[in-house]
Structures are given as C-alpha cells and as structure tokens.
Amino acid sequence: MAEADSFLHLARPLGPVAVGTAPTTAPLNVVIQPQALFSILDHSLRRNADQERVIGTLLGTRSEDGTEVEIRSTFAVGHTETTDQVEVDMEYQKQMLALHLKANPKEVLVGWYATSSELNTFSALIQNFYSGQGDGTWPHPAVHLTVSTEAGKDIETRAYISAPVGVTAERAADSAAFIPVPYEIRYGEAEKSGLEAIGAARDAEERRANIFTDIEALERAIEDVLGMIDRVSRYVESVIDEEAPASTALGQYLLNTLALAPKVEPADIERDFNNHIQDVLVVSYLANTIRTQMELSNRLATAQLTLGGESGSGESGDKRGGQRGGKGGRGGQQRTQERSGEEARAPYPFLCQPRRTRSYEERTNEAQNGKEEKK
C-alpha cells in the first residue's frame, strides 16, 4: 500500500550534472515486491545483538523514462557502525552485485536499505556511495528504503531519494538531503494466498496451518468478501448519518469499484456461478479418477513384472523337458513309420521274414532220421 503521509515530492536532477549530460528525473513511484521485504526482515532477525541496524543492496528494474523503480530482490552487506565512523565491506558488495547481475541480467542496482527509520550522517555517506558513478546508480538516483523492525511495533517502511547539499565538493561528499517518495507494496493473488496461509499459523500453538481445498478456499474468500461489504455498508451509513467524517478519496474509490460491477441480472450471475461450480467439480472428479487409474496401472504393472519373473523359470524348464520328450517321440514315430512302410511294400508279410539258419547238429539229426525211415 502507498504511504499515507503527505510530503512534497521534487522531481529534479540529483548530483552534479556534467557538461553534455541530460538531467536525470527522480522516480515518481517505488514498487516493492513482498519477497524483498521478507529478505530484509530475515536479515534483521539474524543480526548480532549489539547491532542497531543492518544494511544491504536493493536490486530491481527501472522503467525506460526512470519514473518508476521496482524493487525485486536484496542481499545483505556487512558493515560496522560506531558513534564516530562507519565501515562498509565494499569489496563484498561489488562481488555479490556481480554474481546477482550475472544470475539475473534483467535486474539492476537501484539502491540500498537499512533496518532503522533514523537518518544520520552515516546514511548520507552510504547514500553517496550507492548513487556515485562507476559502481553506483549514476545517472539515476539511488533509492534508500528504511524498514523499522522494533519489537512490539508495526513494521514501518519509507522510501527516499537524495539531493546533494554543501558549499564545497568535500562537504557534498558526506552530506545529502533525503527526499521522501511515494511507494507501494505490490503483490499478486498467489502471493496473497500464500501469505494468508502462513498467517493462519500465527495463533496456533504448533505454528502449523492446514492447506485448504479449492472449495474451502472459495468459501473463505466469499466470506471475506461478504465481511468487507458489510464493513463498507456500515461506513457509508455512518457517513450518511453524519456519525463519521466523509472522505472524498474513499468515496471516489468506492464509486470506481461499483462501476466495475457487471450490468447483469442477479439470476444470471447465480446461474453462471452454479455452472462454474459444476465445471470445477467435474474437473476435480476427472483429475481424481485419472490419478487413481494411474496408480492402479502402476501397481498392476509392478505385480505383473514380479509374477512374470517367477513363472518364467518354470515355463523354461517345462519347455526343455518337452523338447527332450518331443525328440524321443519323433524317433519312435519315425521307426514306426519305417516298419509300416516295409509292410506296405510286401504283399505277404510272412514272405518277408528272414530264413532261419540250421546248425550242424540239426542237419545230422535230420539225416539219421531220414535213414531210419527208409529202413
């Protein structure tokens, strides 16, 4: 959200302008991404107990005309600060900046941050370092973002640019006039939903939050919208009854919001909404069905592979035994076919029998028997 405090915003060249150099216009708006703020808060929580504040570098994008700066990411820079002097690890800052710009070529150096709302002489020194030529943001002004992180108080954020002050160049090097500029924290619906889910665990003892389903999230969103409508209605009624002061800006905002409402009948809106709910339910049912089918298919494939490996060995053994038995069967069958072929070639099977060879004793006995018969 934008800063509510009123201030005078000056758009003017910052720093000494060289001959032939066009004047640089200060940014009219600073956009802060939520992840950049989270990084700053995390750095503040990890600081040493004796450190009052920590500083770091701001990275982001800048519009072509330089009127808008978007802060997307940050990284911490070590520094030592006392009542008399301040020391910043400039070499570390340069190396980390080179690494970040190599990983994200679209981002550029836009400024620096500090976790304290106080502006002092050391702030001017650091500001001049970040806005200088060479490794600084020159010819664009450097944005200084302050984030107060005092315990027990709300987080307060401010954005500044600087203008050089001082009669001489030596005095201008350690002096600067900080000029506040408007800013806004811009986030999308996904980031808002994630932040609400994280914030739901704030009051829980276990610091855990359950993730809502689509239907539950839709129900909560509708309840929030109804609550906001009731709150706005009560405010409008109190203004009409002169119980609360009127706000022209708020009235204009409400008027613009009402102008965005579609000019349709409530019955048509209800019908379209019910159709949308039916579509969401159908898509959810189909997604669950496909997920279940895929899981079942994977389990069946796994079971088939497991059972196939066990039965494969048994089938191979049976196959080998069958092959051996088959060979014997083919041999016997072949011999049977040969015998049947010989029988077919002989019209009288008994003629094909081989002659029996008689021994010497048998022939002698036959001869004696023949002599006796003759007698």
UniProtKB/Swiss-Prot annotation:
Q: Where do Gly residues bias regions lie?
A: 323-332
Q: Say where the protein is mainly found.
A: cytoplasm
GO MF terms held by the record: metallopeptidase activity; translation initiation factor activity; translation initiation factor binding
Compositionally biased spans, kind Basic and acidic residues: 336-345, 358-375
Q: Which UniProt keywords apply?
A: Cytoplasm, Initiation factor, Protein biosynthesis
Highest taxon, organism lineage: Eukaryota
Region Disordered: start-end pairs: 307-375
Q: What InterPro entries has UniProt attached to this entry?
A: eIF3f, EIF3F/CSN6-like_C, JAMM/MPN+_dom, MPN
Q: Subunit comment for this entry?
A: Component of the eukaryotic translation initiation factor 3 (eIF-3) complex.
Q: Which family does it belong to?
A: Belongs to the eIF-3 subunit F family.
Q: Which HAMAP family match?
A: eIF3f (MF_03005)
The protein's name is: Eukaryotic translation initiation factor 3 subunit F
Organism, as annotated: Aspergillus niger (strain ATCC MYA-4892 / CBS 513.88 / FGSC A1513)
